[in-house]
């Protein structure tokens, strides 16, 4: 049996769950922590890796939806898949049932492979998908909704309607604020955000090294 086939359930490292809605600046904050020497595991990156050419995930998707779901270079046609599952709950449920266990298993493996004093798990749907159960503490990157919308429209070049539908599909800002252990306001100057993040980082180091 290959190492990948063995199901790993225990996490040996101290884990900080980092989350926030679309356009809140999760990547910028995780990059700052990475610059401080902290290993980062990104759920979105893993979600792409489990459907790379040659992966079991992509093979299953092609078997289910047909070869038309592939681009000419053999990669997954993400926009075509998004259209298929967006308005069809049966397709959406099938896809989630396939991918969620693959993503979770790789997340656990990557968290255990981290060698820094603590490890960050970045996940936009940390609470929604129950990934917070793998975390010792959680940090919400928070901005007002109008800032979220403005940043996302500008960054992703998508319509206001699309942004609002993405936000509506996520847990509300208020719910996330209630669930998170710590909140970092990212609607300020980079200097202030860095200052507060370093203070949080020092606290996490103390907790992790206890």
Swiss-Prot record:
Q: Which residues form the DPCK domain?
A: 15-210
Q: In which pathway does it act?
A: Cofactor biosynthesis; coenzyme A biosynthesis; CoA from (R)-pantothenate: step 5/5
Q: Give the record's GO CC terms.
A: cytoplasm
This molecule's function is given as: Catalyzes the phosphorylation of the 3'-hydroxyl group of dephosphocoenzyme A to form coenzyme A.
Tell me which species this is from: Pseudoalteromonas translucida (strain TAC 125)
Sorted alphabetically, the Gene Ontology BP terms of this entry are: coenzyme A biosynthetic process
Gene this protein is translated from: coaE
Name of the protein in its database record? Dephospho-CoA kinase
Q: Which PANTHER family match?
A: BIFUNCTIONAL COENZYME A SYNTHASE-RELATED, DEPHOSPHO-COA KINASE-RELATED
Similarity section: Belongs to the CoaE family.
| Cellular compartments annotated | Cytoplasm
PROSITE patterns attached here? DPCK
EC code? 2.7.1.24
List the catalysed reactions: 3'-dephospho-CoA + ATP = ADP + CoA + H(+)
- CDD domains referenced in this protein's UniProt entry, alphabetically: DPCK (cd02022)
């Amino acid at each position: 049996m290959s190492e990948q086939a063995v199901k790993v359930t225990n996490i040996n490292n101290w884990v900080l769950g980092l989350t926030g809605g679309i356009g809140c600046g999760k990547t910028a904050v995780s990059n700052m922590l990475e610059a401080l020497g902290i290993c980062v595991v990104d759920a979105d990156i893993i979600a792409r890796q489990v459907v790379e050419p040659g992966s079991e995930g992509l093979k299953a998707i092609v078997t289910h939806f047909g070869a038309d779901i592939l681009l000419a270079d053999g990669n997954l046609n993400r926009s075509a898949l998004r259209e298929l599952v967006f308005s069809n709950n049966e397709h959406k449920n099938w896809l989630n049932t396939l991918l969620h266990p693959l993503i979770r298993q790789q997340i656990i493996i990557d968290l255990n492979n981290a060698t820094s004093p603590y490890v960050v798990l970045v996940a936009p749907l940390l609470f929604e998908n129950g990934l917070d159960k793998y975390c010792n503490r959680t940090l919400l990157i928070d901005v007002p909704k109008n800032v979220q919308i403005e940043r996302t429209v500008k960054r992703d070049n998508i319509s206001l309607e699309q942004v609002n539908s993405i936000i509506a599909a996520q847990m509300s800002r208020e719910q996330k604020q209630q669930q998170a252990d710590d909140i970092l306001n990212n609607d300020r100057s980079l200097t202030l955000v860095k200052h507060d993040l370093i203070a949080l980082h020092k606290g996490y180091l103390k907790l992790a090294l206890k």
